[in-house]
C-alpha cells in the first residue's frame, strides 16, 4: 500500500520528539507489511466513519483511513488529543 500524508499529519509529525518520529516510521513499516500486526493494535475509532487508529507507543497514536490501495494518514500525537480529533 501507499501512504498519503494530510497537511495536519505533517504538521503534527513535525512537532513530535525524535524518538517518537522513529517509532512512527517503524509503525508505518509494520502497517505496510501487515495491517493487523499485533503490536499496532489497529481498530476502528468508535463514532467515526472508516477512521482507524494504530498504536505508535504507549503514549502515541496515529489515525488513518484506508481508501483503495492507500493509507491516508490523518493525525499523530499523544493518545487522548489524537483520538478526540482523529
Enumerate the predicted regions with their spans.
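A short, surface-exposed loop/turn module that caps and links secondary-structure elements
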Residues: 29-54
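Short amphipathic alpha-helical/adjacent loop interface patches that line ligand
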Residues: 13, 28
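Residues in soluble alpha-helical coiled-coils and helical-bundle/repeat scaffolds
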Residues: 15-18, 36
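Basic nucleic-acid-binding interfaces
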Residues: 4-8, 14, 43-50
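Enriched for short, Lys/Arg-rich terminal
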Residues: 2-4, 11, 18, 22, ...
Amino acid at each position: 500500500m501507499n501512504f498519503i500524508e494530510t497537511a495536519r499529519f505533517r504538521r503534527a509529525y513535525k512537532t513530535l520528539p525524535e524518538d517518537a518520529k522513529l517509532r512512527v516510521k517503524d509503525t508505518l513499516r509494520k502497517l505496510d507489511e501487515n495491517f493487523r500486526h499485533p503490536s499496532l493494535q489497529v481498530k476502528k475509532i468508535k463514532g467515526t466513519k472508516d477512521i482507524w487508529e494504530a498504536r505508535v507507543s504507549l503514549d502515541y497514536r496515529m489515525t488513518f483511513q484506508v481508501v483503495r490501495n492507500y493509507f491516508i494518514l490523518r493525525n499523530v500525537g499523544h493518545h487522548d488529543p489524537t483520538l478526540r480529533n482523529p
